[in-house]
Design a protein with these regions (language model features):
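A membrane-topology feature that recognizes alpha-helical transmembrane segments
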Residues: 1-148
């Protein structure tokens, strides 16, 4: 098994554990982003990892700090998870993860809004399952298909 495959497998398993934990408990334990950072050391590219951490995780930190409104919350666990994902993936795959994750989260929120017959602002979704889908998709897409 190549280092790229080991890294991708660990990345996927850690994101899956974050997704399950977030769905059950509505929080993400600090250990998961810490282990993701360690996973990012496999095939470590310092500039890409640092840029990914800042440019992928940074907007989530800003949103969590600046947007305070009923019905909208990005938790600290989500911010740490996205920063760690950016560290593992780098900038472009991290941005692909963000677009895929948030697009699916919005679609899911709209469907739930319709099914539950409640306003969109009342829908509460854990984000880690969407980050898991987007992260695994972005990793394997960029690792093998696009060769970025």
């Amino acid at each position: 098994m190549t280092p790229l495959m080991v890294k991708g497998t660990l990345f996927g398993l850690l994101l899956l554990s974050a997704a399950v934990w977030d769905m059950r408990n509505r929080e993400i334990p600090n250990l998961i982003p810490a282990l993701l950072l360690l996973c990012g050391l496999i095939g470590f590219r310092p500039a890409a990892s640092a840029a990914g951490l800042l440019l992928v995780g940074g907007p989530f930190l800003l949103a969590a700090v600046l947007i305070k409104r009923d019905g909208f919350a990005i938790g600290g666990g989500d911010v740490k998870l996205k920063g760690a994902c950016g560290f593992v993936l780098g900038v472009w795959p991290g941005l692909i993860q963000t677009v895929l994750s948030l697009s699916l989260a919005v679609l899911t929120g709209l469907v739930e809004c319709r099914l539950q017959k409640q306003p969109l602002s009342a829908v509460r979704l854990p984000l880690a399952p969407f980050f898991c889908f987007g992260g695994v998709s972005a990793y394997w897409l960029t690792a093998f298909a696009l060769q970025i």
